[in-house]
């Protein structure tokens, strides 16, 4: 009964109405897809519903309308959407729950640029109509590699400027054994200059280190910049390189330099989490700002250490970028997909991809992720 909750529900209603209005004006058809479906491999566990009429058999609740909307495209419906209820049996998080509602859509015979134009237009229309806010278009684009290298996240918060920097070559100039060992084993050293944070106590720095450890880091090194150079933390190992460090990192007196060494992904995500924590501590996350971006050029596959095989990074129906098709099976880890995420203020708002429309390419993808021809035919024969 609170006014705050009523206001949010009213806004949700207005947003839903504006989405429908915009998409229908752009020749989309709203089509409802089944809720009780066959279980197919997706990103999370299915919720299962026992069948009364066929004892021992189960329906699954949809994690997304993925397969149905692909069938709609094949059937000649060029533009589809629905406000879809989705169900995923996964651990609860701040931005994850067992059921959610998503704006689901699919388009036929389009490029990535066409999709971006539709989504950007929809968000611009919805924000203006419901909140009176003008969103600058087009949205900036970051490759997955750039987002991870600069912000330590594939859903970066762009409301503040702190950027990760590569410290690997500078680490070679120092005498810090841990960093040299990391580099020798093929890892990287990342740096983050926290402007004006040199007055942070060891207790506060230890809290930042704990944030990094949550993401797999072994520790967090630091040094402070003052008028005559650097001091504290690991500064004694870099005394001979202090001027070059300050110059290349563009640090200034009063700054805190945070350093982290590990294999590339762990180093990026761990220091990225520290960056995010600093954004909160320094009140840099303005709730009245909306900073959108497209993250593109994601890897198509990721290595599953436990099962010793390749898994799809998103799902199995994403088209590889054309330049990788000749050597798809030789080096799956290097293959980039035609997929993209829309992010805003550190949150992933949307995810999409260009779908595979060639059954031979689809069979090759199934083979790489471990499906035999028989298994692929049994599970996805209706699609192939």
Describe every region a protein language model picked out.
Residues 1-384:
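Class II aminoacyl-tRNA synthetase catalytic cores and aaRS-like
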């Amino acid at each position: 009964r609170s006014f705050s909750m009523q206001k949010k529900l009213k806004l949700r209603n207005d947003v839903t109405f504006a989405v429908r209005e915009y998409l229908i004006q752009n020749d989309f058809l709203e089509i409802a897809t089944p809720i009780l479906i066959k279980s197919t491999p997706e990103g999370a566990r299915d919720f299962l519903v026992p069948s009364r009429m066929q004892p021992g058999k189960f329906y699954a609740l949809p994690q997304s309308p993925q397969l149905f909307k692909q069938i709609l495209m094949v059937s000649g419906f060029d533009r589809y959407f629905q406000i879809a209820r989705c169900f995923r049996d996964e651990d609860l998080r701040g931005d994850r729950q067992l059921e959610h509602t998503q704006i689901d859509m699919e388009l036929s015979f389009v490029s990535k640029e066409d999709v971006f134009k539709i989504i950007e237009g929809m968000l611009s229309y919805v924000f203006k109509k419901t909140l009176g806010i003008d969103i600058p278009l087009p949205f900036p684009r970051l490759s997955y590699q750039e987002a991870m290298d600069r912000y330590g996240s594939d859903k970066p918060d762009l409301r503040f400027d702190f950027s990760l920097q590569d410290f690997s070559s500078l680490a070679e100039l120092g005498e810090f054994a841990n960093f040299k060992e990391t580099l020798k084993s093929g890892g990287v050293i990342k740096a983050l200059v926290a402007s004006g944070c040199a007055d942070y106590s060891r207790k506060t720095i230890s809290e930042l280190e704990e944030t990094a450890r949550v993401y797999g880091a072994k520790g967090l090194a630091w040094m402070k910049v003052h008028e005559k150079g650097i001091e504290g933390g690991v500064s004694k190992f870099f005394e001979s390189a202090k001027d070059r460090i300050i110059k290349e990192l563009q640090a200034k007196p009063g700054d805190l330099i945070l350093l982290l060494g590990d294999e590339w992904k762990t180093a990026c995500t761990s220091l990225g989490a520290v960056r995010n924590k600093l954004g909160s501590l320094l009140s840099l996350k303005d709730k009245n700002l909306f900073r959108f971006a497209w993250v593109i050029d994601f890897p198509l596959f990721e290595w599953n250490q436990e099962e010793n095989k390749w898994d799809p990074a998103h799902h199995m129906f994403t088209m590889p970028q054309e330049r990788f098709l000749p050597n798809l099976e030789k080096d799956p880890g290097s293959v980039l997909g035609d997929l993209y995420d829309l992010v805003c203020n550190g949150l992933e708002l949307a995810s999409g991809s260009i779908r595979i429309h060639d059954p031979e390419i689809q069979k090759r993808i199934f083979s790489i992720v471990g499906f035999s021809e028989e298994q692929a035919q049994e599970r996805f024969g209706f699609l192939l």
